Swiss-Prot record:
<keyword id="KW-0922">Interferon antiviral system evasion</keyword>
<keyword id="KW-1035">Host cytoplasm</keyword>
<keyword id="KW-1088">Inhibition of host RIG-I by virus</keyword>
<feature type="short sequence motif" description="DLNP; interaction with MAP1B">
    <location>
        <begin position="136"/>
        <end position="139"/>
    </location>
</feature>
<keyword id="KW-1097">Inhibition of host MAVS by virus</keyword>
<keyword id="KW-1223">Inhibition of host TBK1 by virus</keyword>
<keyword id="KW-1106">Inhibition of host STAT2 by virus</keyword>
<dbReference type="GO" id="GO:0039722">
    <property type="term" value="P:symbiont-mediated suppression of host toll-like receptor signaling pathway"/>
</dbReference>
<keyword id="KW-1045">Host mitochondrion</keyword>
<dbReference type="Pfam" id="PF03438">
    <property type="entry name" value="Pneumo_NS1"/>
</dbReference>
<keyword id="KW-0945">Host-virus interaction</keyword>
<keyword id="KW-1080">Inhibition of host adaptive immune response by virus</keyword>
<dbReference type="GO" id="GO:0039564">
    <property type="term" value="P:symbiont-mediated suppression of host JAK-STAT cascade via inhibition of STAT2 activity"/>
</dbReference>
<comment type="subunit">
    <text>Monomer. Homomultimer. Heteromultimer with NS2. Interacts with the matrix protein M. Interacts with host ELOC and CUL2; this interaction allows NS1 to form an active E3 ligase with ELOC and CUL2. Interacts with host IRF3; this interaction leads to the disrupted association of IRF3 with CREBBP and thus reduced binding of IRF3 to the IFN-beta promoter. Interacts with host MAVS; this interaction prevents MAVS binding to RIGI and inhibits signaling pathway leading to interferon production. Interacts with host MAP1B/microtubule-associated protein 1B.</text>
</comment>
<dbReference type="GO" id="GO:0039557">
    <property type="term" value="P:symbiont-mediated suppression of host cytoplasmic pattern recognition receptor signaling pathway via inhibition of IRF7 activity"/>
</dbReference>
<dbReference type="GO" id="GO:0039723">
    <property type="term" value="P:symbiont-mediated suppression of host cytoplasmic pattern recognition receptor signaling pathway via inhibition of TBK1 activity"/>
</dbReference>
<keyword id="KW-1092">Inhibition of host IRF3 by virus</keyword>
Length: 139
């Protein structure tokens, strides 16, 4: 199959309620196939929901272990929270793919963080998402 290079998907996110707040989410793995990495990201990390014509990215899990360990070596969400524990809601701004054949990822692929939404704001959106998804996301 040949040797895999270290690849990373970097997702640039913007806080839904504060346009000045931006976060970068990254997931790293060894793979030659970008589609495997994007599929792993979509299945293990985030769900996207379209509201009023805008696609929002919702962090569903903060687990640092993804289901397909032979594809995903490491995923790093650091302080990105689980949605069911309060969570954040972001609008996706851009998605970047980083790859290094020497196994090193440069500093340009590091993460920045944004702030937590207020409890009342989050509850309001959780209720809307619960209706949209057809099940209750609130504890």
């Amino acid at each position: 199959m040949g040797s895999n290079s270290l690849s990373m998907i970097k997702v640039r996110l913007q806080n839904l309620f504060d346009n000045d707040e931006v976060a970068l989410l990254k997931i790293t793995c060894y793979t030659d196939k970008l589609i495997h990495l994007t599929n792993a990201l979509a299945k293990a990390v985030i769900h996207t929901i379209k509201l009023n014509g805008i696609v929002f990215v919702h962090v569903i899990t903060s687990s640092d272990i993804c289901p397909n360990n032979n594809i995903v070596v490491k995923s790093n969400f650091t302080t990105m929270p689980a949605l069911q524990n309060g969570g954040y809601i972001w609008e996706m701004m851009e998605l970047t793919h980083c790859s290094q054949p020497n196994g090193l990822i440069d500093d340009n692929c590091e993460i920045k963080f944004s702030k937590k939404l207020s409890d009342s704001t989050m509850t309001n959106y959780m209720n809307q998402l619960s209706e949209l998804l057809g099940f209750d996301l609130n504890p």
